[in-house]
């Protein structure tokens, strides 16, 4: 049982995303630790990429800044190695496929050695993912797969068969970014998905406040907040303020 599975046995998942290298690797380490201190219990560490088609403007701009500072996939793994000296909470590497492809087959074992627990490749459909899935499982890294509102039952069966750790439900079409409410069809979609899988389901793409997080947890096993944190980091939020922000968004934390 890996750290992701252990976490879901303890409590619902509060997942935070940040783009590694935005503001420098030291700043990223500081931010990861601040988020963990604020109650985040799973971290998604984003590998900056030059064509992040699934991401909205906030995360696209973070990728541009991180790449401008020379951040590479190996730098991201060094960051995770440093984080592992301080914390054992699960880490999911959030990436596009090209950086993995460019790094070669050894990258999966390097990911495992750095302390990565799961890998989510945002632009790799399950139908084309066989080599990636095999490499993940050989390295004992959970392949985290995506579901969307348009995922068919047949495709969901395939995703359920190959995914591990958890499934990530993208609760609305389009790119990442802050939204005001969850989609109206969210409860029905979640119930449909849950009837077809025993894996925990987290949901994201737009959750931006405590109320939305609480609503998500009525149906999902966890929620993801990304753009809000990325924007705050870009604006120079202090590590203590980032911890307080994370606490303020957590439905299980006492009201701020």
Swiss-Prot record:
GO terms for molecular function: tryptophan synthase activity. CDD domains: Tryptophan_synthase_alpha. The keyword Amino-acid biosynthesis applies. Keywords: Amino-acid biosynthesis, Aromatic amino acid biosynthesis, Lyase, Tryptophan biosynthesis. It is an enzyme of class 4 (lyase). InterPro entries: Aldolase_TIM, RibuloseP-bd_barrel, Trp_synthase_alpha_AS, Trp_synthase_suA. It comes from the Bacteria. Pathway: Amino-acid biosynthesis; L-tryptophan biosynthesis; L-tryptophan from chorismate: step 5/5. SUPFAM superfamilies: Ribulose-phoshate binding barrel. It holds the Pfam family Trp_syntA. One of its GO terms (cellular component) is cytosol. It catalyses: (1S,2R)-1-C-(indol-3-yl)glycerol 3-phosphate + L-serine = D-glyceraldehyde 3-phosphate + L-tryptophan + H2O. The keyword Lyase applies. Its EC number is 4.2.1.20. The active site is at 44 (proton acceptor), 55 (proton acceptor). The alpha subunit is responsible for the aldol cleavage of indoleglycerol phosphate to indole and glyceraldehyde 3-phosphate. Belongs to the TrpA family. Tetramer of two alpha and two beta chains. This is Tryptophan synthase alpha chain. It comes from Coxiella burnetii (strain CbuK_Q154).
């Amino acid at each position: 049982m890996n750290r992701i599975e252990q976490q879901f046995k303890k409590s619902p998942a509060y997942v935070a995303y940040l783009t590694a290298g935005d503001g420098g690797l030291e700043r990223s380490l500081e931010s990861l630790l601040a988020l963990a201190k604020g109650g985040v219990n799973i971290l998604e560490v984003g590998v900056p990429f030059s064509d992040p088609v699934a991401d909205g403007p906030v995360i696209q701009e973070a990728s541009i800044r991180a790449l401008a500072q020379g951040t590479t996939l190996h730098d991201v793994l060094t960051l995770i190695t440093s984080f592992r000296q301080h914390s054992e909470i699960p880490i999911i590497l959030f990436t596009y496929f090209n950086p993995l492809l460019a790094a070669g087959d050894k990258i999966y074992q390097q990911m495992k050695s750095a302390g990565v627990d799961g890998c989510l490749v945002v632009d790799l459909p399950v139908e084309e993912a066989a080599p990636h899935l095999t490499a993940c499982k050989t390295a004992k890294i959970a392949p985290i797969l995506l579901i969307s509102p348009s995922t068919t039952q047949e495709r969901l069966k395939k995703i359920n068969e190959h995914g591990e750790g958890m499934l990530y439900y993208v609760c609305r079409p389009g790119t990442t970014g802050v939204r005001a409410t969850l989609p109206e069809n969210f409860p029905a979609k979640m119930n449909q998905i849950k009837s077809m899988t025993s894996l925990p389901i987290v949901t994201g793409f737009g959750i931006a406040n405590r109320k939305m997080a609480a609503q998500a947890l009525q149906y999902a096993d966890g929620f993801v907040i990304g753009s809000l944190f990325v924007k705050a980091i870009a604006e120079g939020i202090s590590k203590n303020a980032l911890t307080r922000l994370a606490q303020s968004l957590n439905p299980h934390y006492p009201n701020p």
